[in-house]
Amino acid sequence: MRRPHTLLAALLLAAGTAAAQDYGQAATLKIWDNTTAPHSNGIATPEREPEPNRIVDVSQAVLYIFPADPAKATGQAVVICPGGGYVKLCIDYEGYDMAKWFAANGITAAVLKYRMPNGHPEVPLEDVEQALRIMMGLEAGATGFTAGKVGIVGSSAGGHLAASASTLAETKPAFSILFYPVITAEKGKGHQGSFNALLGGSRNAESD
């Protein structure tokens, strides 16, 4: 088992810290932004928080790390994807509140502030896959958790992202926990706003 404090030290060395909100996390790791990621979401306006813990116009992917309680550490970790209809992130009750619960129960949690798709569905998917790679220690210089012990958690639109990572990404989580996920695009059953924000003008019957 690779210990959480070893992971944090290695990640901080490899990725550096990013100035960010204080949610009680032990470390804040910048993954990339629109200039360094494989794809851009095309959002040029600065990130905003129009109401507490509701973040919009996200163009920089960041991980907030909550280490497991050492007395209860299981050697497992999760990447948490908050929801928000792919237009904002509800980062409290679908993010760091969950992370604190997992950490208190021996599971290191990393809340992912992923970039909004803005009609570019590949953007949040590449963010979550990179987050998984970091937590698994697959990036140069990082010592992560055993790949078979890194899972993913997602709520609402974040549940859609978690499900996408579990089925479409090259680097897949070992397990998935989905809370009220947006799964179907069928009219009258799925949240249409999430799919409109995810796919933008490219949405059609085939993409649904």
Regions found by a protein language model. Give the residues of each.
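Bacterial N-terminal signal peptides that target proteins for export
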Residues: M1-L8
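Alpha-helical structural signal
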Residues: L8-A9, F195
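A ubiquitous, low-specificity "background" feature that marks scattered single residues
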Residues: A9-L11, R133
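Hydrophobic h-region of N-terminal signal peptides that target proteins for export
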Residues: L11-A19
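Alpha/beta-hydrolase superfamily serine-hydrolase fold, recognizing
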Residues: Q21-D208
